[in-house]
Amino acid sequence: MKLFRGPTASFVAAAATLAVVSGVNFNSDVSVKTTSAATKTSSTKQTAVQSAKQTSSDSAVSLAPVEPVAACSDLLAVDLTAIGGSGSNITAAEETDSDGITYCSVTGNFASTAGWQVMMPVANWTQRYMQVGCGGLCGNINIQPGAADGSAEVSNGEFALASTDMAGGSDGEFGLDEDRRVAFAYLAVHQTAETAKKLIKAYYGQEAAYSYFNGCSDGGREAVMEAIRYPNDFDGIIAGAPAMLFTFQNSFHHGWLSVSNTDDEGKRVVIADRASLLHDAVVKACDSLDGVEDGLLSDPRLCNFDPSTIECAADATDNSTCLTSAEVTAMTKFYNGPKDSGKYLTVGEEQYGSELAWSGVFVSDSYTGDIMSTNTALAAIKYLIFEEYPGDNYTLSDFDFAKSTIELLRERHPLLDAVSSDLSKFHKAGGKLILWHGWADPHISPRTTIAYHEALQKNMGKSALNEFERLYLLPGVYHCGNGEGPSAIDLVTPMLEWVESGTAPDAVETSTPASTGDSKFGQWAKSGSGAGGPPSGAALQRNLETEASASTSGSAATTVTRPVYPYPAVAKYKGAGDVNDAANFEKGGALYTKTTRSWLGEDFFKPYTPTKA
């Protein structure tokens, strides 16, 4: 019953219903997409798609809705032992409503204790599956598709959805357990994909026509990890602000930001309102470098602002409009990153124009406030990225920002990192990859994503890469959303068009978000280290992406729209008209043409064989 669509769907459903009444064997193995299964060639898909029932959807292909052939509660009988190991179980299978959409929500756990949730629409399933990534060190399940602002398929509840907590937790202690560490590194995501596909087959009587992955932050790492390790799991992968260089990201990067903003007394050197002072100076100095004064830096690499230019005079008694010497030193470290013998230890640190985003990450509102970067770094350093456990009393003052430490990261690099520049198997399978990153992201440097894009080009060739990969950079946008720049974006629709009809994406319009809620897409869990799926009867965890409106370009009443183009192209102002209107921009050439700077860990981006544990 593969790929039945259009007019045939109702007949298939009827036949499958009879099979259920007669007693379907839910414990039989389902053929998840493997290398051999990948021979579902594009021509086969196109033939099937041609018979699809057309609807009012704006996506490239409109697939006929398929109704369930089994009761939701029947899915409790599905055996997942072959997928998740002995002890894997389904804890609940029941219908529940969210935003007027009724889902069959199925939850459970794998042997590693990783929890998962699959949600299948009772009506209007248009034969697509989307798995959503999990942010931070995970430990919770929140199925919230991001980069989907304007996607009819997402907002109408047409996707079967799933996610996993990856057996993780924000304190990182799960890393001491090998099974949970492996589940977090890669395995739980793959097992969830296999589980969802098996449940979809059992519930609807047919497989999903297309499968997609959509994640940001660690979810972005998970996305690229799937392309590397399991190239046939998904037809299309959207990876936002990917924490793909995990071992560096959560040690050298966050660790450096923490120690650089901590004085000898353990207090903060720079606080939020002082970062705001710096931001104003940066924008004043560099805003016009991209050809338009709009409060945004289209490519921060053009900016070379020196914080010392607004340093207070030695005899100043009022520093309300200038920076202290200590602040200048700390801010310069934020931008430059750590070095050993004059050589950089990271790809790139904070970008000019990101200053307002520092608050809550490595800058606090007060001189005695905690900063997230400290906890982030310690969780990874103590429990995940090194083979040897450094002990309970380990602090960031014990971390050596040196080349020798990079050598210690190599052991778990092929387990945790997702930066192999060989995606040839994913390419051969017909997969499509969209990378995206906010230029003002304080958590993960967009330069890491650029460096990965460049590594792919170098290893695979520009022509081959152009067949299946695109990178979008969003000016003024923070981590997975929000910011001074327009951050609402729909990359789902272009991905569907690319995968299902072969139309490669080009210009994508962004806008200021209209909603006012907090986004959980790609974000860290607030607390907790426990694993396991939602308990029986747990509330449905489907939420559309929403973003805070505290920081957007223009006034609160102003809607800003702006196109973004595949890197290295940028949106170029036409020279006339409202700078807040996308219609007044066109595709422009690269503003910055240098490749990523040389740094001591650049060989991590070379092709490598991922390890299992």
List each model region and its residues.
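Fungal secretory targeting signals
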Residues: 1-29, 34-37
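Catalytic-loop region of hydrolases
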Residues: 23-27, 33-35, 40-128, 132, ...
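Cap/lid segment of the alpha/beta-hydrolase catalytic domain
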Residues: 135-205, 251-252, 259, 393-407, ...
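Alpha/beta-hydrolase fold nucleophile elbow
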Residues: 206-217
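Glycine-rich nucleophile elbow surrounding the catalytic serine of serine-hydrolase chemistry
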Residues: 215-225
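A catalytic-pocket lid/entrance helix-loop region that shapes and gates access to the active site
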Residues: 225-227, 232-339, 473, 487, ...
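Short beta-strand/loop motif that positions the catalytic acidic residue
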Residues: 435-437
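Histidine-bearing beta->alpha loop at or near hydrolase active sites
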Residues: 468-482, 514-518
